[in-house]
A protein has these predicted regions:
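Core catalytic alpha/beta fold that binds nucleotide/phospho-ligands
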Residues: 1-117
Length: 117
């Protein structure tokens, strides 16, 4: 049974500006495992990656019904399977978490569906 649905969209230009102004923002968004993946990417892909992960975590907070204030961004971890598919590996939700991320040149969007067992 679906317990929640959340969607978020991020402007990548804005994400790049935030990174340039305050690099500590990266560690407020990413878990250590996510940061490891981030550090292996080129600058353009880093912005897309961070934007996508930020959108995932915002979408999760909407689906979970709390907003980011009650759930820290690092409470949710989105890694990838061998084929590159994103997968939520850590969250406060006890059921199944489905995630989809997409990018264009200017935007990143993510959708989260929470499913009770």
């Amino acid at each position: 049974m679906i317990a929640g649905i959340g969607v978020d969209i991020v402007e990548l230009k804005r994400m790049k500006e935030v990174i340039e102004k305050n690099e500590k923002f990266i560690d407020r968004v990413l878990t250590p495992e996510e940061r490891n993946l981030f550090d292996q990417l080129g600058e353009k892909r880093q912005v897309e990656f961070l934007g996508g992960r930020f959108a995932c975590k915002e979408a999760f907070s909407k689906a979970y019904g709390t907003g980011i204030g009650k759930v820290k961004l690092t409470d949710v971890e989105v890694l990838r399977e061998e084929n590159g598919r994103p997968i939520v590996t850590k969250s406060p939700f006890e059921g199944k978490v489905h995630v989809s991320i997409s990018h264009t040149e200017i935007m990143a969007i993510a959708q989260i569906i929470l499913e009770d067992d």
